[in-house]
Amino acid sequence: MHGLLLAAAGLLSLPLHVVAHPQPSTSLAGRGVDLDAYRMADRSSYMSSDDMKLKQPAIASLSGGNYVDTATEVVKRMMPGMTFRMADDHYVGESGISHLYFRQTMHGMDIDNADFNVNIGKDGKVLSFGHSFYTGPAPDRAPVEKRDFSGPMRAFHGACKALNLPINADKATIQTMNEHEVMFVGTSGAMSDPQGKLCYMAKEDGTLALTWRVETDMGDNWLLSYVDAKETDKVHNVVDYVSHATYQVYRWPIPDPTEGKREIVENPWNLKTSPFTWISDGKTNYTTTRGNNAIAQANFDGGEDYLNNYRPNSKNLKFEYPYAPNMSPPKSYIDASVTQLFYSANIVHDLYYMLGFTEKAGNFQVNNHGQGGKGNDFVILNAQDGSGTNNANFATPPDGKPGRMRVYIWTKAKPARDSSFEAGTVIHEYTHGLSNRLCGGPANSGCLNGMESGGMGEGWGDFFATAIRLKPNDNRNANYVHGEWVNNSPKGNRLYPYSTNLQTNPLVYTSCNKYNEVHAIGTVWCSILYEVLWNLIDKHGKNDGPTPVFENGVPNDGKYLAMKLVLDGMAIQPCKPTFVQARDAIIDADMNLTKGSNKCELWKAFAKRGLGVGAKYDPKNRTGSKAVPKECQ
């Protein structure tokens, strides 16, 4: 195979120079390309704990041996005769659930969008599983035997042309990485050397396509483009690791600078979740905004370099710099901006760690100090990023590669406003990293690229930002609007406020039928989760402190319990989940964590907004339901 790749590359190393406008956009709109048209379909199935007992009792009764053997047996029984491999990112989560991930193979190559995840409960029995394995006709011969496909350089050319990417490959050469993967060396315009991988892809029409997966990190978009290996001018699907948004933002825990004053905090880290503090990686102690979890700096030109960019430095570790909302221009308070961004991101790291986003779950750290997972992947935090305005985004590559958060200046007020000072931006964007690492496993960052699954990615960000900002006197009548301060508008930037009042916010599951945009769908998902939040708070009370209190591994209040169940559900659900599957995963998370003691509170919350027992997913005609199980009526 090495010889075949190199031979094809040598014949097809065509000069390439594609020019595009460097305008950031979630859809490459500045280059005339709509990425939504290339989204993968949400095609996973999910077998919940309750469904499995009824439909697959033999699977439900599996136990004994180790969890790897049990999970492998599930895949063998459910998919007899199919070939697959186990990913190396399986782990036992903080809730005691073992999460294992498998990838379907064909003729020794991955089917890149065919995944199977199995969840083994604390009792050693199968809790649930989900999959998107391909079950259609298989090619009778391996492509390497027929040699009827084009080489990687032609596919690279096809991806750049179809997506109008500003990459110059006039002097590009191909470097073979392994049997099926190559690197394009000598290009310019991308933030790192593009890569190619020969793999299959299951198409929406039920057939299988041989593709070159071309990976290009363009900064505002980090793309996996599945180019047909025979017709290289055809791009089947595109996954974007970058999640873009314009969100409600607030300073931790203050919603925005209008609701509080800046104060000096001393040693704000939690040594249980950041044992090296925030300004050390266990090997080097820093006197700047750099540590094990994150590295923060100015990025005025919007470029890819960050190590050499400006960041405040204080030998006496006093990161105390002036800032007021009426200061202008933004560069005049860059020290305060970088410091605030660094503080907020580290706070989120520590909180999510407590809730279960640890090293083995794929969190963002340089030094995992022997706790599992892959290190060398802190979050790169770019303050006042010059690549855009009125936005923010987060790039989530697989575990072991740094995440990248860009926060911009907002120009909807005078003077302009810096979103580093609203922690909601950081919470929302960081949550993209959380959900992309948990869903499908730490090694698979492409599980939330469908329209409904991508919408949930946005909704989870809103949910965590909203739950964290709850005030001590709030009750279920509290309404929250996203984006008031940065947008300079009391209506914010969402369709409706988050509310438990159906007149204030009428969104239900079937509202998604009229939306074809991830932020709108995300607003529906967060509206549903907001009902979950208040049902659990009404039952268990609300901890207004900055961190959860656990009793036997379970948060003892409703707010943090809701956050914990939603986070656990991310790890349980299948790759490219639907609302229905994510609902079932949250209910299964509660079954594992509390033995189902909150089952009815959860079902009633989901049913209130149309995601009850009879809800069914169809991308164009979802069916709503307000029904709950008999035991909850």
From Swiss-Prot:
Compartments (UniProt record): Secreted
The cofactors required by this protein are: Zn(2+)
Q: Which SUPFAM superfamilies match?
A: Metalloproteases ('zincins'), catalytic domain (SSF55486)
At which residues is glycosylation annotated? 285, 592, 621
Which Cys pairs does UniProt list as disulfide-bonded? none
Q: Which residues form the signal peptide?
A: 1-21
Spell out the molecular function terms from Gene Ontology: metalloendopeptidase activity; zinc ion binding
Those residues forming the propeptide, per the database entry, are 22-245
What does the record note about the cofactor? Binds 1 zinc ion per subunit.
Indicate whether Glycoprotein appears among the record's keywords. yes
User: Would you identify the family this protein belongs to, as annotated?
Assistant: Belongs to the peptidase M36 family.
Protein name per Swiss-Prot or TrEMBL: Extracellular metalloproteinase 5
Q: Which organism is it from?
A: Trichophyton rubrum
